[in-house]
Amino acid sequence: MNARVEEAYGEVERITRREAKNFAYGIMVLPREKRRAIAAIYAFARRVDDIADGDLDPARKRKGLHELHAALDRPAGDDAMLVALADARTRFRIPADALHALVDGGLQDLDRSRYTDFDELRGYCTKVAGAVGICCVAVYGSHDVERAETLGIALQLINIIRDVAEDWQLGRVYIPQDELASFGVSEADIAAGNASPAWHALMTFQAERARAYLQDGLGLLRSLDGRSALCVSTFAGIYRATLERIEARGFDVFDGPPHLSTLTKLRIVGQGLW
């Protein structure tokens, strides 16, 4: 491996340590080559998020995301993230269509801020999170793409529950519109931070669905080697613990999401070791 690629991997690992509040704890248990490949996937996903959620005007966001699409189909150039990702794609046969789907998810965030029903939301989650699962499972060495996608969707559903207030500030509501109506919750309730009994019932429903997806997705563990399985179970354990904290607060996420301490996250890693 040449110095340029080594430096690129060093950069994506720094990005992951700095930015990934949960991801870094899972990948720390992987062998070096796999850990660096997953860090490259994370850095790419982070770039998509930073463009879609950043302060650029919509036209420049769209341009930036289309440039990422194009970058996936040509030599990496001098961009450290793309250099590391290109090497990881070669080593682990990370599917290009999953990476393109991730960019499509970022573009969808520019075009849509509401989802009529869960089928529509699931399509979005498949792009922004299921695609990440598909990329990662190539690195883990499993062919269970279906459960990898399901697990990615599960984690995104938990993110949606956790980030309701933050997403509202960005002008987005990911909870399906028909479910808001069914439980008698309005967008005005979200704006007001109204953790009412109706809100609690709605979010209990969201949590139960996320937990069902998580349980199904964890079937992936059966196809993984020990360290890859530990990585995935750590991700899942951290997200499960986050969901439990949110439930314990009565789904009042309007003052910000709960944060797990470093010690708690390390304990979750340790639980997988025994």
Which residues are covered by each model-predicted region?
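Catalytic cores of Mg2+-dependent Asp-rich isoprenoid enzymes
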Residues: 1-156, 161, 165-274
